[in-house]
Swiss-Prot record:
Domain EF-hand span(s) in chain numbering: 8-43, 44-79, 81-116, 117-149
One GO cellular component term: myosin II complex
Residue sites binding Ca(2+) 3 per the record: 94, 96, 98, 105
Positions contributing to Ca(2+) 2 binding: 57, 59, 61, 63, 68
Source organism of this protein record: Heterocapsa triquetra
Binding site for Ca(2+) 1: 21, 23, 25, 27, 32
UniProt protein name: Calmodulin
Domain of life: Eukaryota
PANTHER family: CALMODULIN LIKE 3, MYOSIN LIGHT CHAIN 1, 3
Keywords: Acetylation, Calcium, Metal-binding, Methylation, Repeat
Amino acid sequence: MADQLTEEQIAEFKEAFSLFDKDGDGTITTKELGTVMRSLGQNPTEAELQDMINEVDSDGNGTIDFPEFLSLMARKMKDTDTEEELIEAFKVFDRDGNGFISAAELRHVMTNLGEKLTDEEVDEMIREADVDGDGQINYEEFVKMMMAK
């Protein structure tokens, strides 16, 4: 399944993997998965984290390595984002709940994920998604951007 991914997608997933793999040892543990989930406002139990890892841990060693992560992402891309998942993702970014993602909100979430972005990079991300030019991202623009990925 992972062989249907483009090189660009694989590079993006490698970057995502390294956000999870906090100690850089090439595997994602339940602890590391929990850290990232909590930084996104989720609060999974230890059992839920273990279940998530077990779902993709094909060699049964209790952690996720990059090939396992790739096959998970390839699977996830096939069941493309349901509307519910998109709404949840939008809410993670729209911290004040006003229906818009501002540059500050985008920077905050990206920083929580370990991505230190310059103001220029944040502004560029907003500009790319901001169809109506109001300087922030509304839900429709967010959906368009997510579907274009």
